[in-house]
Amino acid sequence: MSKRDYYEVLGVERGATEADLKKAYRRLAMKYHPDRNPGDKESEDKFKEANEAYEVLSDASKRAAFDQYGHAGVDPSMGGGGAGFGGANFSDIFGDVFSDFFGGGRGGGRGGAQRGSDLRYTLELNLEEAVRGTTVSIRVPTLVNCQPCDGSGAKKGSTPSTCPTCGGIGQVRMQQGFFSVQQTCPRCHGQGKIITDPCTSCHGEGRVEEYKTLSVKVPAGVDTGDRIRLSGEGEAGTHGGPTGDLYVVISVREHEIFQRDGKHLYCEVPISYTDAALGGELEVPTLDGRVKLKIPEGTQTGKQFRLRGKGVAPVRGGGAGDLLCRVAVETPVNLSRRQRELLEELRDSLEGDSSHSPKASGWFDGVKRFFGDL
């Protein structure tokens, strides 16, 4: 059966750069690696084919020979110079590939100790708690070391036996085409030993599920998305590995009055038609209590008043933000006969005097000009 063109195998153009070759090879190696496709002969063949293609094309002299003579220039069975390990450098590629398979580094090292997973817990707070800070108690599901076996996974008093697959080394060597790769033993996971008499409490896992109650101190000024790291409060590691961390992620609930944007707070303040026209004074809420806000006469809907320092002091330091109050003028409803009469008198008295409604007057003038131009 004739071999496919090496450029075709990797899916690159003949003028591909070294970076292009490496990227293409890594993609194929990840896709067809035997550990991802156990028992799949077709994937194994494609993996070997990609290895062979990259081994030739990543070496300048072999690539030149292939470009000139094709497979005959590099295949010893066809009279060429052959394709041994030569100048191809697979170490950097497989460092990346196997880190994806095994969680970092080829083989993971002797002993197979692995750090426990980090945990994430979403903590909901109201706005007042987020602004002022608080201390809360949380209950988190996690994995802890099994006490009866002290995390070993073996029944107390029993002794693990040497792994027959790796002979106690913790790593195995796989032949892949023209080269071999060393990786973590799939049976003992790098331990070099297997448990023949597992602990009945954890069934040989070394860890058990448990709820952990923790006290979390929330600093003042936190906002949605902020994280609090509790070091060593994640899942227990395996085979003596370190414990992971717990990340408490803040989520601030919506407030019925205030909206927050960074260190500033916003609220809408409804005022009466008469207060807007005549001016007045009203109380508005802040997180520190009520304060008086002076409303000047002629205030329009949308007017914004700034109360300095009545916002939020950021968790990372700096002065407190402001509270911005946006006025919304309410139109009176459910009027009595006398109230209607008074408003009608007011309307009649304002008729024809544009000085009382400059925006409306300007708008109507614009409308007239618009229709006059049609």
Curated annotation (Swiss-Prot):
Cofactor note (record): Binds 2 Zn(2+) ions per monomer.
Domain J, residue spans: 5-70
Main location: cytoplasm
Cofactor: Zn(2+)
Domain of life: Bacteria
GO biological process, one term: chaperone cofactor-dependent protein refolding
Mapped zinc finger ranges (CR-type): 133-211
Keyword Chaperone included in the entry's annotation: yes
Binding site residues for Zn(2+) 1: C146, C149, C199, C202
CXXCXGXG motif repeat windows: 146-153, 163-170, 185-192, 199-206
SMART domains with a match to the protein in the record: DnaJ (SM00271)
Subcellular location per the Swiss-Prot or TrEMBL entry: Cytoplasm
Binding site for Zn(2+) 2: C163, C166, C185, C188
GO cellular component, one term: cytoplasm
Key words, A-Z: Chaperone, Cytoplasm, DNA replication, Metal-binding, Repeat, Stress response, Zinc, Zinc-finger
PROSITE patterns hit by this protein: DNAJ_1 (PS00636), DNAJ_2 (PS50076), ZF_CR (PS51188)
Protein's job: Participates actively in the response to hyperosmotic and heat shock by preventing the aggregation of stress-denatured proteins and by disaggregating proteins, also in an autonomous, DnaK-independent fashion. Unfolded proteins bind initially to DnaJ; upon interaction with the DnaJ-bound protein, DnaK hydrolyzes its bound ATP, resulting in the formation of a stable complex. GrpE releases ADP from DnaK; ATP binding to DnaK triggers the release of the substrate protein, thus completing the reaction cycle.
UniProt record similarity statement: Belongs to the DnaJ family.
NCBIfam families: DnaJ_bact (TIGR02349), PRK10767.1 (NF008035)
Oligomeric and partner information: Homodimer.
The name this protein goes by in its record: Chaperone protein DnaJ
